[in-house]
Regions:
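The feature marks proteins involved in alpha-glucan
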Residues: 1-34, 38, 70-174
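Carbohydrate-binding surface patches
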Residues: 31-47, 567-609
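Conserved, mostly hydrophobic/aromatic
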Residues: 41, 91, 148, 202, ...
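Beta-strand-rich binding/interaction modules
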Residues: 41, 47-58, 62, 605-622
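C-terminal beta-strand-rich structural cap/linker in extracellular carbohydrate-active enzymes
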Residues: 43, 85-89, 630-651
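Conserved alpha/beta catalytic core and glycan-binding cleft of carbohydrate-active enzymes
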Residues: 120, 352-353, 357-509, 516-520, ...
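Substrate-binding/active-site clefts of carbohydrate-active enzymes
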Residues: 151-330, 339-359, 365, 377
Length: 651
């Protein structure tokens, strides 16, 4: 008997019998050849299915409707003879829930707003030279991640980017950009190369529904955590969203340009939910892809009205297929999972194993947010912080323990952290240095599982947070010397800690959103990178640049095994000072035989005694590039500047 209620459908979908009858691991989507194209759709509850063909991605009448043939395992298929390159299509499906039109869940490109899927020949769409694009080899010691939205990166009129490319994929391809084209102060890709960051994490670049691609973008803005088509690049980031091949080509051009600069690309992926409950997956197989409560209603652990059921076999297959597609076809270097706590541990470990099978796949980064956006009906082990020791050691998490210890809680603007003088937080600073490998609070397999950070796109920027803790009515545009020192100290802590350092784009030039803690659909002007600040706060930019280089010169800070954290020697200093020593690993090419690091969160100078031997001053609270030159050699007692991270190298 056919189920009648959502609860009965839930029982069916989670039964072993349904899995046996419908699990399918053959090809899905459009399989193109010049001689013809196979279309295959997994829709086991459908009673009828047809494909509608169009010449254009938007507008224009349907030029033909053809029935699909039902195959085994819930698959419907049709063969379209002849060269179908450039054709668009959707499906008409009749299920127990009614009749509707749906795009292809496995579509690789689409027309405006992702309504119609596109058939195309990759060889005719790929940019010139794409076959020569390779992922840059980035050793652990050099790894650092800079997070940005495609839109924010170049929307500023002063970015020096061509007007037509601002806020687009192609902005990343323009060489030699400078502030207002002054020829002096680098911006965009030119700036990133000078900064020395090794990965750019791109906020969602697959097709999302919160920006209307058919309308001008001047007053539209969204971060894009509202997925519509998981395997299709976002059209508003292309120069022509009406032509499906353009978004594919220009996305690849962006990736190739970053790779050409030696920078890896991390893709922010949002499989945990879809933009609306009425979406392509729910139209093709109603209810199957989304987690349900016991009464059959949709679980809402995402806070967006639905959550992806990663534990259901064909949903799991879909997620893994999609990630592997981006890794293979777009040469993506890493994946950041939004609300990773909504996925089950088994799925994430299976995905890691599949990525590892790809050429160079073991170097593809994989990490995520180890929490949820609400109560979830997931009854298996969640891929969250509590189950970190169940995840593969090369699946990392954003460490909110480190974030909150350094700068204070993210939900209370006035709550201070270590850099603002919060008593007692120094214990967590020590744990952060060792990537929590020596703490009972959070036992990772290895330091590589910990993302050390203080700011990301969510919540207040670091600069805004520092000012809001200090002042009841902060002047966000002002140059505040105390906040600058605290900013340098915060960076000095997480960039000398073990784990993978990560920061929000513009943190290094005091990025402000004027106290707005959730700017996901605020104005483009509020969200965009203000490239004038990169020049105004050039000394802060240089401080980050120096720390990035210093970290690379001492490879053990980026070590992936637990031997590094175990080798850290903490000094018995008076609170709230933190000091530690780490010997270099034999044969790793370190510039110094050991590092000695001190953090002083007080607003007065402090005197400490160095361990025995001679120590070169590498970085203090003002400059992080002393290590590049012949700075002074210290022994015995030394003075720590107020609000400073001070680093010495043993010589």
């Amino acid at each position: 008997m056919e189920p009648r209620t959502p609860a009965e459908w839930k029982t069916l979908f989670e039964s072993e019998a349904f899995a046996r009858q419908t699990e399918y691991y053959g090809p899905l989507g459009a399989e193109y050849t010049p001689a013809g194209t196979h279309l295959r759709l997994w829709a086991p509850t459908a009673k009828q299915a047809a494909v509608n063909l169009y010449r254009r991605g938007t507008g224009g009448a349907c030029v033909g409707t053809l029935p699909l043939q039902q195959q085994d395992k819930g698959v419907w298929s049709i063969y379209l003879p002849g060269d179908q390159h450039g054709k668009y299509y959707d499906f008409t499906l009749t299920t127990p829930f009614g009749t509707c039109n749906a795009a292809d869940p496995y579509a690789r490109s689409a027309g405006v707003n992702g309504v119609r899927s596109m058939i195309f020949d990759p060889a005719r769409v790929d940019p010139q030279g794409w076959e020569r694009d390779v992922r840059p080899v980035i050793p652990p010691a050099r790894r650092s991640v800079w997070e940005v939205s495609v839109r924010d990166f170049s929307q500023d009129p002063a970015s020096g980017v061509h007007t037509a490319w601002r806020g687009k994929f192609l902005a990343f391809t323009q060489q030699g950009t400078t502030l207002s084209s002054d020829g002096i102060h680098p911006t965009c890709l030119n700036y990133l190369k000078r900064l020395g960051v090794s990965y750019v994490q791109l906020m969602p670049i697959f097709d999302f529904g919160s920006v209307d691609e058919s309308r001008p973008l001047t007053r539209q803005y969204n971060w894009g955590y509202d997925p519509t088509n998981f395997n299709v690049p976002e059209g508003s980031y292309s120069t022509d969203p009406t032509r499906g091949e353009v978004r594919v080509r220009e996305c690849k051009q962006m990736i190739a340009a970053l790779h050409g600069a030696g920078i890896g690309v991390v893709m922010d992926v949002v499989y945990n939910h879809m933009y609306r409950s009425d979406n392509v997956l729910s139209r093709v197989v109603p209810l199957y892809y989304f987690r349900q409560n016991d009464d059959g209603s949709l679980s809402n652990g995402s806070g967006c009205g639905n959550e992806f059921a990663s534990e259901r076999p064909m949903a799991r297959r879909y997620l893994i297929d999609s990630v592997l597609y981006w890794a293979r076809e777009y040469h993506i270097d890493g994946f950041r999972f939004d609300l990773m706590g909504l996925y089950d541990v088994e799925t994430m470990n299976l995905l890691r194993a599949e990525l590892d099978k790809l050429p160079g796949g073991r170097d593809i980064l994989m990490y995520g947010e180890p929490w949820q956006g609400g109560c979830s009906a997931l009854h298996r082990y969640e891929a969250n912080k509590n189950n970190l020791n169940m995840l593969n050691e090369r699946i990392g998490i954003f460490c909110d323990n480190t974030r909150d210890a350094i700068k204070g809680g993210c939900f209370d603007a006035r709550e201070p952290g270590y850099v603002e003088g919060r008593p007692g937080s120094f214990w967590d600073i020590g744990a952060s240095v060792a990537a929590w490998c020596r703490s009972e609070k959070l036992p990772p397999h290895a330091p590589g599982q910990i993302i050390s950070y203080v700011s990301a796109h969510d919540n207040f920027t670091l600069w805004d947070k520092l000012l809001m803790v200090r002042y009841a009515r902060p002047e966000f545009a002002a140059v505040d010397k105390t906040a600058l020192a605290q900013n340098r100290l915060a960076a000095g802590i997480y960039l000398t800690s073990m784990g993978l350092p990560f920061w929000q784009a513009g943190e290094e030039f005091a990025r402000t959103k004027k106290g707005q803690g959730n700017s996901y659909h605020s104005s483009p002007a509020l969200n965009r990178l203000d490239w004038h600040r990169a020049e105004q706060f050039h000394s802060l930019v240089d401080y980050y640049r120096g720390l990035i280089g210093l970290r690379a010169a001492f490879p053990r800070l980026g070590a992936l095994d637990k031997a590094g954290p175990a080798a850290i020697e903490f000094f018995p200093l008076e609170q709230p000072l933190v000091g530690w020593r780490l010997p270099a690993q034999w044969g790793d090419g370190a510039a110094w035989s050991a590092l000695c690091v001190y953090y002083n969160p007080t607003e007065t100078a402090q005197v400490v005694t160095l361990p025995g031997g001679s120590w070169k001053l590498l970085s203090d609270g003002i400059s992080s590039s002393l290590w590049r030159g012949s700075s002074r050699i210290c022994t015995g007692q030394t003075v720590l500047l107020p609000l400073s991270a001070t680093v010495f190298g043993q010589v």
